Amino acid sequence: MQFFGRLVNTFSGVTNLFSNPFRVKEVAVADYTSSDRVREEGQLILFQNTPNRTWDCVLVNPRNSQSGFRLFQLELEADALVNFHQYSSQLLPFYESSPQVLHTEVLQHLTDLIRNHPSWSVAHLAVELGIRECFHHSRIISCANCAENEEGCTPLHLACRKGDGEILVELVQYCHTQMDVTDYKGETVFHYAVQGDNSQVLQLLGRNAVAGLNQVNNQGLTPLHLACQLGKQEMVRVLLLCNARCNIMGPNGYPIHSAMKFSQKGCAEMIISMDSSQIHSKDPRYGASPLHWAKNAEMARMLLKRGCNVNSTSSAGNTALHVAVMRNRFDCAIVLLTHGANADARGEHGNTPLHLAMSKDNVEMIKALIVFGAEVDTPNDFGETPTFLASKIGRLVTRKAILTLLRTVGAEYCFPPIHGVPAEQGSAAPHHPFSLERAQPPPISLNNLELQDLMHISRARKPAFILGSMRDEKRTHDHLLCLDGGGVKGLIIIQLLIAIEKASGVATKDLFDWVAGTSTGGILALAILHSKSMAYMRGMYFRMKDEVFRGSRPYESGPLEEFLKREFGEHTKMTDVRKPKVMLTGTLSDRQPAELHLFRNYDAPETVREPRFNQNVNLRPPAQPSDQLVWRAARSSGAAPTYFRPNGRFLDGGLLANNPTLDAMTEIHEYNQDLIRKGQANKVKKLSIVVSLGTGRSPQVPVTCVDVFRPSNPWELAKTVFGAKELGKMVVDCCTDPDGRAVDRARAWCEMVGIQYFRLNPQLGTDIMLDEVSDTVLVNALWETEVYIYEHREEFQKLIQLLLSP
């Protein structure tokens, strides 16, 4: 027993040693009958607790004099007297005005506030305590406009920051507090309310006060600036409803610029929706638009969708693309480029974005700019070309690769002009160990797209084989353009068409009489039909992938359908535009075996051949071209299984004709035969050129096993599963293969009947999925396409000559 007694005493001593001396505890007043009363103020008594050798402060319950609350228990008399004086001057209004104070938890909170904030008035304490009845006490009312010494804030400031609307009403209606006061930082009650979480407080302030709504603090921020900086979207909405001004300058410009600087998309959208002119506002420091301040792709995309000028310039002449390149914001730069940013815009000191990318040693950015049309030999105001800036790159490997790249595009390695020296002499590079010589570049390695591949791309872009002659508008032969399927890899087709247009100087629509497309090729065929530029389509594809390929497969069809409606019109019919003739492939899946269907913008030719199947089954015929909606035709041709759900009874045309060349030639032959049967032989035009564009050839890889059999052990089971997977992939690839024998058959057919056949399809270094969304991967694919164009420049030159000939 003695052992347990000593253990209890020891534990009690340790507990007392580490216990909080200011912990509020409910006690009986009778426990202090033997203690001396050192001080007494109202219901507050300071006892000298002789047995424990402590000084205890007890608040006697005004409603029950037999009980009380010990507020502290201190060992030093001096500390006890200081705290007693502090408590006695602050507690009286609270226990006199509200019985809620007489609870242990409330008293603990209140006494902690008194100690932690010695400069607070009773009104400040009442706000933080949050008991409404206290604000009816005369002493608290008298302190309603007092400012504390820590921040210079009034009780109303605290109520706003706390977000307590009920206390705010008490202060305004019963205490008649002033609402136009500021703290030491110059912040009004609106600034404090913005930092809270209750937008109703802002609404109450807006109804009761106008002063301070648009006032700037010592940092030059209005409440609206601060709300944008903190990302308080609801606060921004309420401030705008209270008529907060959007045109007050802050240190970073208008509130819209603050929202952009801190990437607060919701706040920026709210401001623009309330005042659309803010999207064009310029900040005072740089003269920059909100788009210049965009730090990520999402913010830039939001502004561009709302009509922001993508090529707006700052005071220094820089566009948003200049800023994105300077800050190495690749994703943001891609968004700007795909929305029409001028890749050759001259900014401060005449620098183009490519000049800046060179100085930043950003290879991916350089690729993107060149792919989107940036010129590599443009000098700035100092006569410096991108070549010269590339020579300053610190890393030797990168420097040599980029300099070689620029040399291969025809850029001259020249120094800035020297005063007093003729331009021809001043621009000549002196002989030194690093001078560039015109040497043949090493073979291209498309399997490993690294820096050395940069050196070849611009040669593809250089219009070395541009022909000035225009074709005869009354030519007697037809030209056919065939576009493969391939999802987002349709970008490769677009890049090939851009090269053809650039070399010929003629729009694709005017170069071809027939256009056939499957899936993504079908969308591009319709784009050609409706006179959409290929540069626009390139940007459109980059934008489309982010809208359509969201989540996991199969993707929702809604975004794709809305996209097609937006681009081609919700009510546009196939026959609304009849030149050139366009056909899109689709697969009718409501029958077995499935059949190929062509969506046309002309009447289908009548054939004399016997039906392939006996019509014992009542199958609904497809819609006539005059009734067929364009967007539905595009949706039906691109309904790739496992990627999107079927569009009614239509599946992706790639299942039967991923390379539509032979089907298109068959259609043209049947069309001409129908004209002859109808006595219109004079309208028949012989097909003279067939151009087939692919979406890139994936690299060939070995397959270890396609054996599927009945397994007899776990090892064989695993082997069978793996073989079934590989076999399934092989079957799909064989069904949708646009190359191989499909190309051989088309070429052979054309050679037999004297038709010029061109198959353009670059070899890719990596396998790219139909739903690829990585900007870097897609830019590299376009880069490889440009390299391919350069390597096949003679074939391109021959093609252009034939297309432009009568």
From Swiss-Prot:
Activity regulation info: Activated by ATP. Inhibited by calcium-activated calmodulin. Inhibited by bromoenol lactone (BEL).
Pfam family, one: Ank
Compartments where found: Cytoplasm; Cell membrane; Mitochondrion; Cell projection, Pseudopodium
GO MF terms held by the record: 1-alkyl-2-acetylglycerophosphocholine esterase activity; calcium-independent phospholipase A2 activity; calmodulin binding; hydrolase activity; identical protein binding; long-chain fatty acyl-CoA hydrolase activity; lysophospholipase activity; phospholipase A2 activity
This protein's domain notes: Has two putative calmodulin binding domains, the 1-9-14 and IQ motifs. One calmodulin molecule interacts with PLA2G6 dimer, likely through 1-9-14 motif on each monomer. Binds calmodulin in a calcium-dependent way.
Cross-referenced InterPro entries: Acyl_Trfase/lysoPLipase, Ankyrin_rpt, Ankyrin_rpt-contain_sf, PLPL9, PNPLA_dom
Impact noted for substituting residue 341 to T: In NBIA2A; complete loss of phospholipase and lysophospholipase activities
Active site: 519, 652
The name this protein goes by in its record: 85/88 kDa calcium-independent phospholipase A2
Enzymatic reactions: a 1,2-diacyl-sn-glycero-3-phosphocholine + H2O = a 1-acyl-sn-glycero-3-phosphocholine + a fatty acid + H(+); a 1-O-alkyl-2-acyl-sn-glycero-3-phosphocholine + H2O = a 1-O-alkyl-sn-glycero-3-phosphocholine + a fatty acid + H(+); 1,2-dihexadecanoyl-sn-glycero-3-phosphocholine + H2O = 1-hexadecanoyl-sn-glycero-3-phosphocholine + hexadecanoate + H(+); 1-hexadecanoyl-2-(9Z-octadecenoyl)-sn-glycero-3-phosphocholine + H2O = 1-hexadecanoyl-sn-glycero-3-phosphocholine + (9Z)-octadecenoate + H(+)
Gene Ontology, cellular component aspect: cytosol; extracellular space; microtubule cytoskeleton; mitochondrion; nuclear speck; plasma membrane; pseudopodium
ANK repeat intervals: 120-147, 151-181, 185-215, 219-248, 251-281, 286-312, 316-345, 349-378, 382-403
Stated consequence of mutating residue 747 to W: In PARK14; has no effect on phospholipase, lysophospholipase and thioesterase activities
Motif GXGXXG per record, residues: 485-490
Tissue: Four different transcripts were found to be expressed in a distinct tissue distribution.
Enzyme class: hydrolase
SUPFAM superfamilies according to UniProt: Ankyrin repeat (SSF48403), FabD/lysophospholipase-like (SSF52151)
Keywords: ANK repeat, Calmodulin-binding, Cell membrane, Cell projection, Chemotaxis, Cytoplasm, Disease variant, Dystonia, Hydrolase, Lipid metabolism, Membrane, Mitochondrion, Neurodegeneration, Parkinson disease, Parkinsonism, Pharmaceutical, Phospholipid metabolism, Repeat, Transmembrane, Transmembrane helix
Region (Calmodulin-binding (IQ motif)): 748-759
Record GO biological process: antibacterial humoral response; cardiolipin acyl-chain remodeling; chemotaxis; Fc-gamma receptor signaling pathway involved in phagocytosis; phosphatidic acid metabolic process; phosphatidylcholine catabolic process; phosphatidylethanolamine catabolic process; platelet activating factor metabolic process
UniProt disease link: Neurodegeneration with brain iron accumulation 2B: A neurodegenerative disorder associated with iron accumulation in the brain, primarily in the basal ganglia. It is characterized by progressive extrapyramidal dysfunction leading to rigidity, dystonia, dysarthria and sensorimotor impairment. Neurodegeneration with brain iron accumulation 2A: A neurodegenerative disease characterized by pathologic axonal swelling and spheroid bodies in the central nervous system. Onset is within the first 2 years of life with death by age 10 years.
Residue ranges crossing the lipid bilayer per the database entry: 480-500, 511-531
Primary role: Calcium-independent phospholipase involved in phospholipid remodeling with implications in cellular membrane homeostasis, mitochondrial integrity and signal transduction. Hydrolyzes the ester bond of the fatty acyl group attached at sn-1 or sn-2 position of phospholipids (phospholipase A1 and A2 activity respectively), producing lysophospholipids that are used in deacylation-reacylation cycles.
Motif GXSXG, residue range(s) on this chain: 517-521
